[in-house]
């Protein structure tokens, strides 16, 4: 009797694979970026073994391709992620997210007094990195937050 210890996640024929997501961040990305708002199959692997990270999350979305803007927005929470475009079971394009200047309509401002929480406006944050930390500044209340504070909303 053979015993195979390798984890196997089914390959997709066509679509997007987001790999090297920090462990415990995959579900948050699915929610924030509305990656489940499709009628296509979405596969998520949580706490998978990773030589580089110890453990990682992985998301596969069949027949859906992310825009460059969407890929770059992932950099706020998964800066070392790779986004692979798959066609006929082969990687045809590999993208690495880079920090965008702005992120709109995705996040919620943590400031409970911000008008973006009570008025029908789309959230909007400017993004910058300082000393290895990602900071987000709300367009409306002009308060600046560490990305963890915004992620918890």
UniProtKB/Swiss-Prot annotation:
Q: Which GO terms describe its biological process?
A: 'de novo' pyrimidine nucleobase biosynthetic process; pyrimidine nucleotide biosynthetic process
A molecular function annotated in GO for this UniProt entry is: metal ion binding
Q: Cofactor binding mode, per the note?
A: Binds 1 zinc ion per subunit.
Q: Which GO terms describe its cellular component?
A: aspartate carbamoyltransferase complex
The prosthetic group or cofactor this protein requires is: Zn(2+)
- UniProt KW keywords: Metal-binding, Pyrimidine biosynthesis, Zinc
Q: Does the keyword Metal-binding apply?
A: yes
Q: Which residues bind Zn(2+)?
A: 109, 114, 138, 141
Pfam families, A to Z: PyrI, PyrI_C
Cross-referenced InterPro entries: Asp_carbamoyltransf_reg_N (IPR020545), Asp_carbamoylTrfase_reg (IPR002801), Asp_carbamoyltrfase_reg_C (IPR020542), Asp_carbatrfase_reg_C_sf (IPR036792), Asp_carbatrfase_reg_N_sf (IPR036793)
Query: What protein family does this chain belong to?
Result: Belongs to the PyrI family.
Read off the HAMAP family from this record: Asp_carb_tr_reg (MF_00002)
Q: Which NCBIfam families match?
A: ATCase_reg
Relate the assembly described in the record. Contains catalytic and regulatory chains.
Its biological purpose is as follows:
Involved in allosteric regulation of aspartate carbamoyltransferase.
Q: What is this protein called?
A: Aspartate carbamoyltransferase regulatory chain
């Amino acid at each position: 009797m053979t015993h195979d210890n390798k984890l196997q996640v089914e390959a997709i024929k066509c679509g997007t694979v987001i790999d090297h997501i920090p462990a415990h961040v995959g579900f948050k990305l699915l929610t924030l970026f509305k990656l489940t708002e499709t009628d296509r199959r979405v596969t998520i692997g949580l706490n998978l073994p990773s030589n580089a990270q110890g453990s990682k999350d992985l998301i596969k979305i069949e027949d859906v391709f992310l825009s460059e803007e969407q890929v770059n927005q992932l950099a706020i929470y998964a800066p070392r992620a790779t986004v692979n475009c798959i066609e006929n079971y082969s990687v045809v394009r590999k993208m690495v997210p880079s920090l965008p200047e702005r992120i709109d309509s995705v996040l919620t401002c943590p400031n409970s007094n911000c008008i973006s929480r009570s008025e029908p406006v789309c959230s909007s944050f400017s993004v910058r990195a300082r000393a290895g930390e990602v900071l987000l500044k709300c367009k409306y209340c002009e308060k600046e937050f560490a990305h963890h504070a915004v992620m918890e909303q």
